[in-house]
Amino acid sequence: MLVLTRSVGQAVILSVAGLKIRVALITDSSGALALGIDAPRSVSIRREELPP
């Protein structure tokens, strides 16, 4: 597993099969940390604990 350190507002770019997926570290209105994910609609995004 690759582990990266990011600050709020910074992102990483994943390139998979020619598709660009951007994952950013953001905060919500309560100050909690969250992941923001920008990906083409053809990319399925789900939480790991949910079935495919």
Residue ranges and their predicted role:
Residues 1-52:
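Compact, glycine-rich, soluble single-domain proteins
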